[in-house]
């Protein structure tokens, strides 16, 4: 029997539950559409340092980014031998990056499964540089998937039906309190939350119409926000320079063929995380 809340799980268990769901048909649909949304936004944004928090290791939404510095932060799970960008294992509310050092930060459903979503958003604001952009992906409660979640039982799969579906307006309010100005939002995945193609085919025309007009009833949304603070002081180190010291301390894992898979092990006592090889 599935537990009634994903928030009772540890970080490793959360990551494995997410990875299992993404490997299925429904999860694959979400991953494909969210990568399409991320690609669309990343093409319009410029930045040297792009970080993703959440998602499945080896399948980052930032794979199409041309930024010279990219990291994918996950909570654990099975790390691939080959990845589009270096992978860091860390907590989503304790990111191993300096303050004001990241140009673009992508949160893939981090708030939906975190025990402390407000702390995750606060940490995202900390590492973003003034003028940096946040791309936040979340499950939409005002969708057919949100209705399906309301009808869920303890026998249903853990994700996404026992995760947190947060209203986009609530996230926007949180962002404003943290000097993150919402700029735009996009929606995707208008099909019914069923893996069987026969059932989905009955509503195909309506699905295409909603997708074409981008009605705000898609299963997922992508919120883009800009960090509003004072501009950089002349002579202040660039984000790339600030992350250079981090990159030097990270050691490639043994047996890597192309891109290194790296681990960051946070200290339990609340001190800054140690950077060690996998």
Each model region followed by its residue ranges:
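A short acidic, Gly/Pro-enriched loop at the edge of an enzyme's catalytic core
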Residues: 93-105
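Conserved catalytic loop of SAM-dependent methyltransferase domains
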Residues: 182-207, 216-217
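A short glycine-rich, Lys/Arg-flanked "PGG" loop and its adjoining helix->strand segment in the class I
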Residues: 118-133
